[in-house]
Amino acid sequence: AAANTYRKIFDHFTPDKLIGFTATPNRGDKVRLDTVFSKIIFQRDLRWGIEHGYLCDIFCRRVNIGYDLSHVRTQRGDYAPGELEEAMEGTADAIAQAYRELATGATLIFAVSVHHAEEIAKRIPGAVVVTGETKDRAAIIKAFTAGEIPCIVNCMVFTEGTDIPRVETV
């Protein structure tokens, strides 16, 4: 709602009351939602969602895929894209190996670039790459949801507002 596209809609229609719902209140661009909404009237946290069955429990494993971010600069609170891609060069084999050893069921993998996504997907049988340029995204999600695709490797697509209940491993 804090994005310019939404703000233009709000400005155009000038609603008397504006109510917002979000599962991702902490935006990547650091724009605060209180610039759009004056107060929070109801909220639940991650723990509440898990305890009440709205979200699945979390099981985390740290996997060493052989990267070094010590020389990667940050820009506006995120890693510099070109530098991050360079730092992640050569990690596709380790990511595919971690997938084979640890993934349970439908898997969603996040890559740092389109090239990185393609390199990872090449190493995972049946994996499909989804990027901002993917034309048949809805068909891919439908096939993934139906169990026809075991793994989606994406680059900057499934970051906010994604709801694919079949995903078991990220």
Label each PLM-derived region with a short phrase.
Residues F10-P15, Y54, R100-L102, A143-A146, ...:
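Conserved catalytic network of the ASCE P-loop NTPase/AAA+ motor domain
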Residues K17, P150-C151, T169:
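Short, Asp-centered acidic motifs that coordinate Mg2+ and/or phosphate
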Residues L108-F110, H116-A121, P125-T162:
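Conserved helicase ATPase core of P-loop NTP-dependent helicases/translocases
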Residues Y6-D11, A96, A121, I141:
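Short amphipathic alpha-helical segments and helix-helix/interface helices
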Residues I40-A111:
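Conserved interdomain linker/interface between the two RecA-like ATPase lobes of SF2 helicase motors
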Residues A2-C60:
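Post-DEXD/H (motif II) to motif III coupling segment of the RecA-like Helicase ATP-binding lobe
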Residues P15, A23-G28, W48, N64-L69, ...:
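Conserved nucleotide-binding/hydrolysis micro-motifs of P-loop NTPases
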Residues I164-V170:
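TOPRIM-like Mg2+-dependent DNA-processing core and adjacent phosphate-binding/basic surface
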